[in-house]
């Protein structure tokens, strides 16, 4: 089995897990990877390798798991407002939610017997660094 086929098999298994949870997964070229809680829909950029798509889907599934838990959903409710209005005091919640989504995605991989490679941690670090960079950027309309 080729490497790409191995990752495609794991990706397909995770798509099936998402479906079991009532989450629709779509693959589109050139889009931003995102989980939409209102639609219970995850969109993944299909331009990337199957391994990369798997890791991103694990992360987005982590966002679904946060949204599916009433306690976590309430905790992270201010995140969308913080993003939209650059509310500084809530921006740490954005980073906290991102870290938790990666963690829950990794736990889901273990739970559903989906092995991940060392590139997972590298992608996780890269994405979290990007979030930190965006969150520490100076915005003209900051509110405390």
Where are these regions (language model features)?
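Post-HEXXH active-site segment of zinc metalloproteases
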Residues: 34, 67-99, 103
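Acidic active-site catalytic centers that drive phospho-/nucleotidyl reactions
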Residues: 60-63, 98
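Short alpha-helical catalytic segment bearing the HExxH-like zincin motif
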Residues: 52-60
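Hydrophobic residues within well-ordered, non-membrane alpha-helices that form the packing/core
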Residues: 62, 66, 105-109
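A metal-dependent hydrolase signature that marks the N-terminal structural subdomain at the beginning
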Residues: 1-28, 93-105, 112, 143
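Long, well-structured alpha-helical subdomains associated
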Residues: 9-10, 49-52, 94, 106-144
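Active-site scaffold of zinc-dependent metalloenzymes
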Residues: 4-52, 64-68, 73-74
């Amino acid at each position: 089995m080729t490497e790409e086929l191995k990752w495609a098999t794991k990706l397909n298994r995770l798509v099936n897990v998402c479906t079991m949870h009532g989450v629709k997964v779509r693959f589109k070229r050139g889009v931003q990877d995102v989980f939409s809680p209102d639609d219970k829909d995850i969109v993944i950029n299909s331009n990337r390798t199957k391994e990369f798509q798997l890791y991103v889907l694990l992360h987005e599934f982590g966002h679904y798991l946060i949204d599916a838990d009433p306690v976590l959903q309430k905790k992270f409710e201010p995140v969308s407002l913080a993003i939209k209005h650059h509310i500084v005091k809530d921006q740490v919640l954005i980073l906290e939610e991102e870290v938790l989504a990666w963690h829950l995605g990794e736990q889901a991989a273990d739970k559903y017997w989906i092995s991940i490679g060392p590139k997972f941690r590298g992608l996780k670090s890269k994405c979290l660094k990007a979030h930190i960079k965006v969150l520490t950027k100076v915005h003209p309309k900051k509110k405390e």
